[in-house]
Amino acid sequence: MKLITNSAEIKVTENEDGSKSFQGIGSEVGVENRNGIVLTPNCIEFARERYPLLYEHGAGSSEVIGDAKVYYDLASNKYLTDFTLYDNAPNINKAVENGAFDSLSIAYYITDYEFNENDALVVNKAQFKEISLVSVPADPNAKFIQNALGEELTEERNKIIESRNALKEIEDIKKKYE
């Protein structure tokens, strides 16, 4: 299995009773995201309904700032995240409400994948790992290939690109002599 992380944006809704509801919207399925990853429909498997919401991918219990339900929504063809922030982090709660924190990072282990003709990583199956509130907002122009794919997948992708380029060179040379 290989670890992947992706970003999602956060929406804050004020309920009639004055409480806040939070929802994160993940990458669309079937579209290459800014990390060069394509998720196939409903490819991420979940071992349980709710997961701890971490702060900046922290592993310690002090970094648990809430809990979240992540799920595939067929109607929108996206992974959605409904989450609650605990009272132990009032500054983080306020920062989310004010828009200072507007990104989630979703991590999962891919168990079945391939690279398509554009060298994008196509995820066919994955096991959900964790979700974190992160300080870096979603940026459509950002490329996080090294962090998103990890070293092992980046090397594999580079080898595929090199092989395709070498094959193209051979085909070009062959055409010259035909």
Swiss-Prot record:
Record protein name field: Probable capsid maturation protease
Enzyme Commission numbers on file: 3.4.-.-
GO MF terms held by the record: peptidase activity
Enzyme class (EC, first level): hydrolase
Keywords: Coiled coil, Hydrolase, Protease, Viral capsid assembly, Viral capsid maturation, Viral release from host cell
GO annotation (BP), single: viral procapsid maturation
Family per record: Belongs to the skunalikevirus capsid maturation protease family.
Coiled coil: 146-178
Native source organism of the sequence: Lactococcus phage SK1
Function, as annotated: Probable capsid maturation protease.
